Amino acid sequence: MTVPTPRHGTPHGGLPGRTVLITGATSGIGRAAALAIARQGARVVLVGRDPERLRTVTNEVARTAGPAPDAFRADFAELRQVRELGERLRDRYPRIDVMAGNAGGMFWSRTTTQDGFEATLQVNHLAGFLLARLLRERLAGGRLILTSSDAYTQGRIDPDDLNGDRHRYSAGQAYGTSKQANIMTATEAARRWPDVLTVSYHPGEVRTRIGRGTVASTYFRFNPFLRSAAKGADTLVWLAAAPAEELTTGGYYSDRRLSPVSGPTADAGLAAKLWEASAAAVGDTAR
């Protein structure tokens, strides 16, 4: 599907003066993207969970690109905080040109949030899905960019069992399922929201803080063969700034190239069912 005529945030490329919202902005890909996008002249809006790291990145962006960015604290493991965040953002910004849904994590043992959802699914998919829907009117004519991963091939999406209660827990599979959900959400959003250019992307294997507090964190933080956060953020930054006519709404990108998806992830009917199940899960009846 090619993009329709609305502006989509940056019709001719570039970001000067645009409002760019980045979740998961306090470390890794989100931090790197915030710095790069601010350097292009955008008004960056940061969202993060940890107040100290949020202050640190706010100061880094200010030193790099001038005025301090706006910053909002929210823990995506609590949907109440996501709803409150949505209200604050709607009150503050009449338009959001780009929303980069980048918040994420991996939980090595099964964890249930106070909302009753498996934590990986909620933090990586449901919370961002809810926030995008809350900001739907502000995103009109803009872009929605969802961080995914080629780990989606390990996912097992079941709209009738979002929590995966029917299967033994696997951290890798839960992570893959959440990333699979983001690709499918982008596909379905492109169908339902034709005035929003919606894409997902694979950042590559990146050195990040994911898995902190576990043995695996050593792999993700210090493996010299993994990409830097800046390299991982490159496709996100490009998707935010590229001319709209160069992009395909609903597409999945890797290294600035459109990449085909396979298996159930490519099933449009399943994507529609996932959308409805996710909306029911977060208690949001808006279309």
Swiss-Prot record:
Catalytic positions?
175 (proton acceptor)
Q: Record's InterPro entries?
A: NAD(P)-bd_dom_sf, SDR_fam
What Gene3D superfamilies does its record include? NAD(P)-binding Rossmann-like Domain (3.40.50.720)
EC primary class: oxidoreductase
Stated EC number for the protein is 1.1.1.-
Which residues does the annotation say bind NADP(+)? 24-30
Keywords, A to Z, come to: NAD, NADP, Oxidoreductase
Q: Which residues form the signal peptide?
A: none
Q: Which GO terms describe its molecular function?
A: oxidoreductase activity, acting on the CH-OH group of donors, NAD or NADP as acceptor
Where, by residue number, does substrate bind?
Answer: 149
The family line of this record is: Belongs to the short-chain dehydrogenases/reductases (SDR) family.
Q: What does this protein do?
A: Could reduce the 13-carbonyl of daunorubicin to produce (13S)-13-dihydrodaunorubicin. Could also be able to reduce the 13-carbonyl of doxorubicin.
PANTHER family (UniProt xref): PHOSPHATIDYLINOSITOL-GLYCAN BIOSYNTHESIS CLASS F PROTEIN, PHOSPHATIDYLINOSITOL-GLYCAN BIOSYNTHESIS CLASS F PROTEIN-RELATED
Q: What is this protein called?
A: Putative daunorubicin C-13 ketoreductase DnrU
Which organism is this protein's natural source? Streptomyces sp. (strain C5)
